[in-house]
């Protein structure tokens, strides 16, 4: 049977963690390995994990940031597929993991499975689907138009998974998805919403740093001219 490694990264996330844990606990699919990588929280995050997901594999220690913690999650995973579900985000339905596994089992096992994402607020009120929508046949070059698949709806075969690049502090997930698409031989879409993603804005300073990082990542993967043309296109779309 296919085993799915669900990985949650948290640090003092007591206020947002409950929906995440409950969504994992209610999954009907039995072959789930749940890994929680905690950055030595000082609140009740770990008590919540232990009470709602008692079978979770917990690591709690200081780290060098989000992507360092995600690398720890990859190292600890033993499942066939890796799926990151951050604190505050939740699986859409109790059958969501089962639906992903059924998609994997349709033919040869894909390297990447992906789906759609619903944006929710802190009250779990739906704000709408992401503006960038996943295409039916996802390819690396599609990410020139932005991150078309939310990281939490991007399920990767462990056999191709590489560590996150810690030289990026805000956009390493974008770089990681590009590198996974580069290594993937087959990507398969699940034509449904997989994840409820908790909306949260970056500060202006972090927002601009994130944009600069993303430009550098795009240039590295696609070259300078395609990256410039893509950003001109972004500006045109925003002004329409």
Model-identified regions with their sequence ranges:
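Short, acidic, metal-binding catalytic loop of nucleotide-sugar glycosyltransferases
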Residues: 22-31
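Conserved donor NDP-sugar-binding/catalytic core segment of glycosyltransferases
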Residues: 94-127
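Conserved nucleotide-sugar donor-binding catalytic segment
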Residues: 129-213
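Acidic helix N-cap motif at the loop->helix transition within catalytic regions
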Residues: 15-18, 43-51
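A conserved acidic beta->alpha catalytic loop
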Residues: 30, 38-47, 86
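Cell-envelope/extracellular polymer assembly enzymes that use nucleotide-activated donors
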Residues: 2-5, 33, 175
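Short aromatic/hydrophobic "clamp" motif used to bind/position activated sugar donors
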Residues: 82
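Glycine-rich, basic loop-to-helix element that forms the pyrophosphate-binding segment
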Residues: 60-77
């Amino acid at each position: 049977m296919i085993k799915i490694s669900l990985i949650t990264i948290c640090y003092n996330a007591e206020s947002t963690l409950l929906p995440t844990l409950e969504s994992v606990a209610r999954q009907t699919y039995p072959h789930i390995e749940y890994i929680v990588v905690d950055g030595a929280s000082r609140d009740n995050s770990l008590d919540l994990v232990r009470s709602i997901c008692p079978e979770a594999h917990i690591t709690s220690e200081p780290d060098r940031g989000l992507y360092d913690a995600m690398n720890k999650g990859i190292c600890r995973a033993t499942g066939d597929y890796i799926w990151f579900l951050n604190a505050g985000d939740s699986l859409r339905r109790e059958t969501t993991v089962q639906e992903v596994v059924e998609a994997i089992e349709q033919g040869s096992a894909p390297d990447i499975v992906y789906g759609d994402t619903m944006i929710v607020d802190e009250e779990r009120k739906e704000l709408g689907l992401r503006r960038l929508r996943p295409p039916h046949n996802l390819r690396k070059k599609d990410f020139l138009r932005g991150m078309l698949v939310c990281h939490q709806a991007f399920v990767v075969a462990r056999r191709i998974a590489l560590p996150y690049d810690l030289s990026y502090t805000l956009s390493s997930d974008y770089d990681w998805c590009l590198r996974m698409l580069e290594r993937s031989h087959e990507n398969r879409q699940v034509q449904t919403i997989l994840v409820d993603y908790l909306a949260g804005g970056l500060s202006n300073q972090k927002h601009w740093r994130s944009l600069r990082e993303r430009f550098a990542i795009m240039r590295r993967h696609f070259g300078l001219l395609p990256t410039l043309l893509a950003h001109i296109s972004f500006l045109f779309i925003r002004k329409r």
